């Protein structure tokens, strides 16, 4: 099992006292992270850097979509990267294309869809499917993401719920920006996104998870980019993120940790 960070930190500090290690250049890993798991990597980064001497250059990048910032589009342009943290189903496509190393893949956390309103606004009832449907139909405006949760809502859940004809006219997909930010500015009354993504946005109140009958779990995973210049360091970071030592950071970010992998 990957050692705990305090142990790593002690070893790193001892090794750092030797002239040989002091002469070594600092390894920097470029980490492309989807918003749903960004809270996790941000939380562990300071201690991980201190313990290992490896610097993490973390960039926000959606798991999918047409924006230039999306991870698949960045890799298609051959932008340098070492590790990707993203929606598992989108990662599967990168594995299939050979852009990430299949044997490096780790599953990290399960995410669920939540609803938010502007801070201080009334919190509508979404405790069951009937109440949820009424809340959607009464809403003045609805926003959802252009990532996995939004695709599911717009293509599967909303049509399945047989909402009134006026609903889709007031619902819109938000590209390249957190849905919570749109809600915080008052540009949408209701916002839907992964709980882990909404938790990071100021100016909103999270009403709660949508009902179980409407819910869809999204798996967040990580892998090493095939063209990584630092494969050993990249694999070590992924091994740590998949260990029980990172479970608290995963949970803090709003995800349900996947059991540590052997």
From Swiss-Prot:
Catalytic activity: trans-aconitate = cis-aconitate
Keywords: Isomerase, Signal
Activity regulation annotation text: Activated more than 1.5 fold by Ca(2+), Mg(2+), Mn(2+), Ni(2+), Fe(2+), DDT and 1,10-phenanthroline. Strongly inhibited by Ag(+) and Hg(+). Inhibited by addition of 20% (v/v) glycerol. No effect by addition of NADH or NADPH.
Annotated transmembrane regions: none
One GO MF term attached to the UniProt entry: molybdate ion binding
Noted pH dependence of activity: Optimum pH is 6.0.
Practical applications according to UniProt: May be useful in development of a bioprocess for effective production of trans-aconitic acid.
Enzyme Commission code(s) on record: 5.3.3.7
GO biological process, one term: response to mercury ion
Keyword Electron transport: no
InterPro entries: ModA/WtpA
Record flagged with keyword Ligase: no
A Pfam family hit: SBP_bac_11
Temperature sensitivity of activity: Optimum temperature is 37 degrees Celsius.
Disulfide pairings: none
Signal peptide segment: 1-22
Role this protein plays: Involved in assimilation of trans-aconitic acid. Preference for cis-aconitic acid is 14-fold higher than for trans-aconitic acid. Not active on intermediates of tricarboxylic acid (TCA) cycle including citric acid, succinic acid, fumaric acid, and 2-oxoglutaric acid or on other dicarboxilic acids including itaconic acid, formic acid, citraconic acid or maleic acid.
Quaternary assembly: Monomer.
Name this protein carries in UniProt: Aconitate isomerase
Species of provenance: Pseudomonas sp
Gene: ais
